[in-house]
Design a protein with these regions (language model features):
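Bulky hydrophobic segments
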Residues: 1-152, 166-180
Length: 180
C-alpha cells in the first residue's frame, strides 16, 4: 500500500516536472542573459559551460517544481490566510510515514545540483544544511499565507533530503576530480 502510494506520488512529481519545463526554461533564459551580461560588462571572457548551464537549468526546474508541489505556485494568497493556517511544532506527529520519505526524496536533487553550480559550496557540509533549511523555512512561512499546513518536521526532513543530495554531489565531485 505504502509503496504504491509512493510510486503514484513520484509519477505525479515527474508529471509536474514535465509541465513546468517551459516555465523553467524561460527563467533559465533570463538567468543566462543576466549572467552573460555581467561577464560582458566586466569584460571577462564569456565561457560556454554546458554542464554548468545544464545543472543550473535542472536546479531551476527542481525549485519551480518544489514550489508547485508545496502549493506556493498556484496557491491563493490572502490577508486572512495566516489565521486559517495550522502550524505544528510537534515532531513526527503522524510518525515516520510515506509523506516523510517523499519529503526527503523531493529535496535530494535540490541539494545535489548546487555542488556543480556554485564554486566552493562543496567545501563545507553545513552549506548543504543552510541551503535546505533556509529554502524549507521560506516555504513553510509562505504556506501560512495560503492556508496550508506548516510543520517543523517538514523543515527537518527537507533539510535532511537537501543534505543527502549535497553529500552525494560532493562525493561524486570528489570522485570525478580525482580521476582527472
Amino acid at each position: 500500500m505504502i509503496v504504491s502510494y509512493i510510486t503514484m506520488e513520484i509519477w505525479t512529481g515527474i508529471w509536474i516536472l514535465v509541465r513546468l519545463f517551459p516555465m523553467a526554461l524561460i527563467i533559465f533564459a533570463g538567468v543566462m542573459i543576466i549572467e552573460v551580461g555581467i561577464e560582458f560588462i566586466q569584460k571577462k571572457k564569456i565561457e560556454v559551460k554546458i554542464l554548468n548551464w545544464l545543472c543550473q537549468f535542472l536546479w531551476i526546474l527542481i525549485v519551480v517544481s518544489i514550489l508547485k508541489i508545496t502549493g506556493i505556485i498556484g496557491g491563493s494568497f490572502g490577508i486572512s490566510s495566516p489565521l486559517d493556517s495550522y502550524i505544528s511544532f510537534k515532531l513526527f506527529e503522524d510518525g515516520f510515514n510515506a509523506a516523510t520519505i517523499l519529503n526527503i526524496c523531493l529535496f535530494i536533487p535540490y541539494g545535489f545540483l548546487p555542488v556543480f553550480i556554485f564554486k566552493n559550496i562543496h567545501k563545507h557540509w553545513w552549506n548543504g544544511v543552510i541551503l535546505g533549511a533556509v529554502f524549507s523555512i521560506g516555504i513553510e512561512f509562505v504556506q501560512t499565507f495560503i492556508g496550508r499546513f506548516a510543520q517543523l518536521d517538514d523543515v527537518i526532513m527537507n533539510t535532511c533530503g537537501t543534505l543527502v543530495g549535497f553529500l552525494i554531489g560532493c562525493l561524486l565531485l570528489r570522485i570525478t576530480t580525482r580521476k582527472k
